[in-house]
């Protein structure tokens, strides 16, 4: 008789399962006999230990596995018979009341996948982002590359300004007491690069070699050094050297230093344009994709399985803990990481995953082999040996699967853009690249 699956609420279901004690014992005895053929028991030759002795040593573990297996098969038959897709793992509780002596009974509580209704794509409003790379952006990038390769020359009597490398001694105290990391000698940094706190850089600006300055500095509340975060320190700095950054000329030697083998400056500029156009394209596509996915999630109204959300939350908690370990945080394993901090985003991710999966199935948006290869070849252009990168990805199934997932998302985005109400938005290059 097919077990009856009961609907509790929303996606939650319950079913009663039963297995025969006789069937369990029959399988247990069969497994014990198999173990007996090779079991090594002190005082007995291999395979000659009494079955009763093996029952005492191996029986409980074998019986546990057999019951789990038989209950698992009974559960699969029940949900298959009811044509249900189970989300996560069931919770099993033993039943004792009203159960015959020759039966083991359990109640399985579980969740099912929802019926995912893909929203009307023509009713969605999304934004397609674009940007333009002009000669000005190429020159701006060239200037950044020059600054990265600047030679610093000490200047007597020069007042420190942005772009200069300042070498100084500093010592800080809080309430008159020195603190860890608050003192250094001959410490170099380039003004204007944001390596130091803004108040520290502001204090150093305008000083010349040999000059000293005392100033207060309040550490931000979210400063990474927790022992000083939110507190005000008094710093004393003494400048030892101010060095002006001398930018290299844009010539053949400079072009060669950036990998342009022929030393051709115009070809270097063309390479720079190609690279920043590729990066700008990736960023605008990323913004467009985010707009599409946000619109899908906002319109996707259905329950999501709590089991899937909880699983995603736990994955994110574990990832956060691994990041703490990599940063060298002491006792990272015991640092409290509140799971509820990830709950909203995890629910969004699960909802989006279900929507995308259903949309791919309905519109047949699976990644085609030629699309995957084209994406790999495009990605490989970021490397010096693109052919090797292509071979590297094509030779490994898991790496190909990573690219297939990206292509699949691209297909979904394009499908939505083809049907939705699309607004075009130009993004200034500086803003797009985080330079504004």
From Swiss-Prot:
One of its GO terms (biological process) is 'de novo' cotranslational protein folding. GO terms for molecular function: peptidyl-prolyl cis-trans isomerase activity; protein folding chaperone; ribosome binding. It is an enzyme of class 5 (isomerase). It catalyses: [protein]-peptidylproline (omega=180) = [protein]-peptidylproline (omega=0). Keywords: Cell cycle, Cell division, Chaperone, Cytoplasm, Isomerase, Rotamase. Pfam families: FKBP_C, Trigger_C, Trigger_N. Consists of 3 domains; the N-terminus binds the ribosome, the middle domain has PPIase activity, while the C-terminus has intrinsic chaperone activity on its own. Belongs to the FKBP-type PPIase family. Tig subfamily. This is Trigger factor. It comes from Bordetella petrii (strain ATCC BAA-461 / DSM 12804 / CCUG 43448).
